[in-house]
C-alpha cells in the first residue's frame, strides 16, 4: 500500500500515453488521483515508508501533467496536499535547515528526486523563492559535495570532503529526469546545460554499451573497477564498483534504462511563439506540428559534445510553406 511504488507506475503510464495516446491512461490516472485525494489526509505520503515523502515531487509532477490535459480542479487541490506532505525542499535548499551541510544527511537518490520539486511547485505558487531554490542549492553543493559530472558525492548518503567518494547510477538517471521536468516547467537554459553535463559525462561510463551490466557507484577519475574495500557508506560486500546486474543493490538495474529514452524525448520543446526549441543537442529527428497546423520535420546532425557545430535541417510536409525563422 506504499505510495512510492505507485508513483513509479504512474511514470510508466505517462510514457505509455505519450507513445500511444491510449485514453485509458487518462481515465485510470484520474480515478487514482481521486483515490489519493480521499486517502492522503489519513495516510500521508510517509505513512508506510519515508520514500514517498522524500520523492513526492514525482507525484506532484504527474498530477500537474494530468491537469494540463483535463483541467479538473480537484487535481490542484491534490497537488496542494501532496506538496504539504512532501519533504520541504525549498527551505532546505535556501539553507533554512542544514541537511545540505551535514554529513550522511540525505540519501543521494532522494536528493535527485527532490531537486525538481520546488520548480514543479512554482507553477502553482508563483513564488520566485521556489523557482530559484535549486540554483541556490547547486551553488552550495558545487563547493561541498559537487562533482564535475553535475552530480554529487553520495554512496548512498551525502559525503563531504573527498572527491573520490562514489556516485550512484540511480542518482544520474533521476537527476536527468528532474532536470528534464524543470526545463519543461521553467524554460531555464541553466538546467539544459546541466542536463547535458550529466548525460554526456556520468551516464555513458556507468553502464556497458550493451546495457547488460552497470556499476552501482562511479568514482570520478577512478583507476580500477575492482572488488575491494572502498570507504563507501554502504559497501555491499565490496561489489559497488564492478560491473554486473546484482552488484551493489539491484535498484540501478531496474532504473538505468530510463536515462537515454527520456533524454531523447527532451531534445525538442514547444516554444511560446508556437514554434520549436532545441534546448539540448544530440543527433535526432522530430516530426512536429507548429504555428497554424504546419507540419515539419526537424533534424539535428552533430557530433556534439565532441564537436562544436550542429546542423539543423527543416523539411515541410506541404510545399507551399517556404519560410522558417531561427
For the regions a language model picked out, list residue spans one by one.
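Glycan-recognition and catalytic cores of secretory/periplasmic carbohydrate-active enzymes
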Residues: 1-326
Amino acid at each position: 500500500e506504499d505510495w512510492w511504488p505507485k508513483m513509479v507506475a504512474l511514470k510508466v503510464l505517462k510514457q505509455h500515453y505519450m507513445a500511444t495516446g491510449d485514453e485509458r491512461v487518462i481515465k485510470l490516472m484520474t480515478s487514482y488521483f481521486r483515490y489519493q485525494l480521499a486517502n492522503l489526509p489519513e495516510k500521508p505520503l510517509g505513512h508506510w515508508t519515508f520514500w514517498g515523502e522524500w520523492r513526492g515531487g514525482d507525484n506532484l509532477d504527474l498530477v500537474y501533467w494530468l491537469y494540463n490535459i483535463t483541467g479538473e480542479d480537484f487535481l490542484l487541490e491534490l497537488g496542494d496536499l501532496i506538496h504539504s506532505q512532501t519533504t520541504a525542499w525549498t527551505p532546505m535548499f535556501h539553507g533554512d535547515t542544514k541537511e545540505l551541510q551535514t554529513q550522511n544527511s540525505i540519501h543521494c537518490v532522494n536528493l535527485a528526486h527532490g531537486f525538481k520539486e520546488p520548480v514543479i511547485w512554482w507553477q502553482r505558487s508563483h513564488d520566485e523563492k521556489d523557482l530559484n531554490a535549486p540554483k541556490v542549492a547547486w551553488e552550495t553543493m558545487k563547493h561541498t559535495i559537487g562533482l564535475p559530472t553535475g552530480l554529487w558525492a553520495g554512496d548512498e548518503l551525502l559525503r563531504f570532503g573527498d572527491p573520490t567518494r562514489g556516485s550512484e547510477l540511480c542518482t544520474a538517471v533521476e537527476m536527468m529526469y528532474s532536470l528534464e521536468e524543470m526545463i519543461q516547467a521553467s524554460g531555464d537554459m541553466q538546467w539544459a546545460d546541466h542536463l547535458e553535463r550529466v548525460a554526456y559525462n556520468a551516464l555513458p561510463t556507468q553502464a556497458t554499451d550493451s546495457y547488460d551490466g552497470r556499476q552501482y557507484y562511479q568514482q570520478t577519475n577512478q583507476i580500477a573497477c575492482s572488488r575491494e574495500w572502498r570507504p563507501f557508506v554502504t559497501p555491499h560486500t565490496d561489489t559497488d564498483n564492478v560491473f554486473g546486474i546484482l552488484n551493489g543493490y539491484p535498484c540501478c538495474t531496474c532504473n538505468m534504462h530510463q536515462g537515454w529514452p527520456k533524454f531523447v524525448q527532451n531534445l525538442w520543446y514547444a516554444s511560446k511563439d508556437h514554434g520549436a526549441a532545441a534546448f539540448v543537442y544530440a543527433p535526432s529527428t522530430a516530426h512536429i506540428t507548429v504555428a497554424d497546423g504546419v507540419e515539419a520535420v526537424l533534424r539535428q546532425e552533430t557530433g556534439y559534445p565532441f564537436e562544436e557545430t550542429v546542423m539543423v535541417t527543416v523539411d515541410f510536409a506541404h510545399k507551399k510553406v517556404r519560410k522558417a525563422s531561427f
